[in-house]
UniProtKB/Swiss-Prot annotation:
The keyword Nucleotide-binding applies. CTP binds at G8, R11, R91, R137, R140. One of its GO terms (molecular function) is ATP binding. It comes from Pseudomonas fluorescens (strain SBW25). This is Multifunctional CCA protein. ATP binds at G8, R11, R91, R137, R140. InterPro entries: CCA_bact, HD/PDEase_dom, HD_domain, NT_sf, PolA_pol_head_dom, PolyA_RNA-bd, tRNA_CCA-adding_enzyme.
């Protein structure tokens, strides 16, 4: 029995990145031997065990054979006869197909170290195409390591393109797709993930609504970058630079989907794109079974982001309607994320990334003014039920009118 560290633990150590999770492969062992040593079985499809002392994961060396469509269509074979090289060849990328023993000796049959030093993401073998989820994984790795200069090998990108065009991506479950998408969006350069998906023709299958934005012009006076797709990537990039949560990043990606449906004869103007985008945002949310908080913010940002940009010009009554749409009195954080998403939208324009965005603080001030209206005096006056709600609305409107009369600092 021999035990090796494999995959990300080896890759990240060689890159000088802190290793957080360690996966190990066991060569020359049986399930019975692992159980006899006290390991706890956890794998449903193939033999994976946990060390009860520290929770580390150990998997028996295995091979796999394609048996059906999608990422789940595989037959696995684990036995003491499976070699380390046979186990490593089933992995996605050469940089993930290296192993290391306890003495630090590297096993690298597929030249992962060479590709690591050259900053190349390259598939190990043609078997890469047997798992469509790998298209998303490679795009995610491209986003994760973009700051180190990693790029996808041309032949790997071509294989990803063939896989995208084969229809195999349609076999992915919403849950597995969203897991990869959400992880990728939380990388430091999530815009690279979207760009790689577009480069390999996967974006038009996974998110055709986003793919449709590329090549759609906007007025140069407001958008020096002109292209709506380029703008969307820039907005997402700004959200990542400002360390925003997944809810904000998802909303930034989807906020302008309506612009992809603007009639050609109306370009480059996009009148009512906010309203037209709502059904598209809803469709993407449903396609990937997106968590409710991400769904809700994406829809609200899509509908109201131009309100945010015009915040200083809005009437008090319109501000009140905006605050009520966000349920700002019970969910203030959601309105805060809206203000941030609007700012990221404004910063995601070529040459305007550092421009001050006073609208965000103005929106925060409006929310504060409305929230500070006390209910107790109205209760003391005898208001209750629907009448209390109307009285509260009137007082909040007064507060917003007073707020608008204050000088903008």
């Amino acid at each position: 029995m021999k035990i090796y560290k494999v995959g990300g633990a080896v890759r990240d150590r060689l890159l000088g990145i802190k290793v957080t999770d360690i996966d190990r492969v066991v060569v020359g062992a049986t399930t019975e031997e692992m159980l006899a040593k006290g390991f706890k079985p956890v794998g449903a499809d193939f033999p994976v065990f946990l060390d009860p002392k520290n929770g580390d994961e150990y998997a028996l060396a295995r091979t796999e054979r394609k048996s059906g469509r999608g990422y789940g269509g595989f037959v696995f074979h684990a036995s003491p006869e499976v070699t380390l090289e046979e186990d490593l060849i089933r992995r996605d990328l050469t940089i993930n197909a290296m192993a290391e023993d306890d003495d630090g000796n590297l096993t690298d049959p597929y030249h992962g170290l060479r590709d690591l030093e050259a900053r190349i993401l390259r598939h190990v073998s043609p078997a890469f195409a047997e798992d469509p989820l790998r298209v998303l994984r490679v795009a995610r790795f491209a986003a994760r390591y973009a700051h180190l200069g990693f790029t996808v090998a041309p032949e790997t990108l071509e294989l990803m393109r063939q896989l995208s065009e084969s229809g195999e991506l349609e076999a992915l479950t919403p849950e597995r797709s969203w897991k990869e998408i959400s992880r990728a969006l939380m990388e430091d350069q999530p815009q690279v993930f979207i760009q790689v998906l577009r480069d390999c023709a996967a974006l038009k299958t996974l998110m055709p609504e986003v793919d449709a934005l590329f090549g759609v012009p906007q007025p140069e006076a407001h958008h020096p970058e002109i292209d709506t797709g380029v703008h969307t990537l820039s907005v997402l990039e700004q959200a990542a630079l400002h360390k925003q949560p997944l809810t904000v990043r998802w909303a930034c990606l989807l906020h302008d989907l309506g612009k992809g449906t603007t009639p050609v004869d109306k370009l480059p103007q996009h009148i009512a794109h906010e309203h037209r985008g709502l059904k598209l945002i809803k469709a993407v949310n449903e396609r990937f079974k997106v968590p409710r908080d991400c769904q809700e913010l994406a829809l609200l940002v899509g509908q109201y982001h131009t309100h945010g940009h015009r915040a200083l010009e809005l009437k008090a009554s319109t501000l009140l309607e905006l605050l009520q749409s966000f349920d700002v009195y019970r969910r203030p954080q959601r309105f805060e994320e809206f203000a941030i998403a609007c700012e990221m939208d404004a910063r995601g324009r070529k040459g305007l990334e550092q421009r001050i965005y006073p609208q965000a603080d103005y929106l925060r001030g409006a929310a504060k003014a409305a929230r500070e209206v006390a209910v107790a005096p109205l209760l003391e006056k005898g208001y209750k039920g629907p009448e209390l709600g109307e009285a509260l609305k009137r007082e909040r409107l007064k507060a917003l009118k007073a707020y608008k009369e204050q000088p903008i600092l």
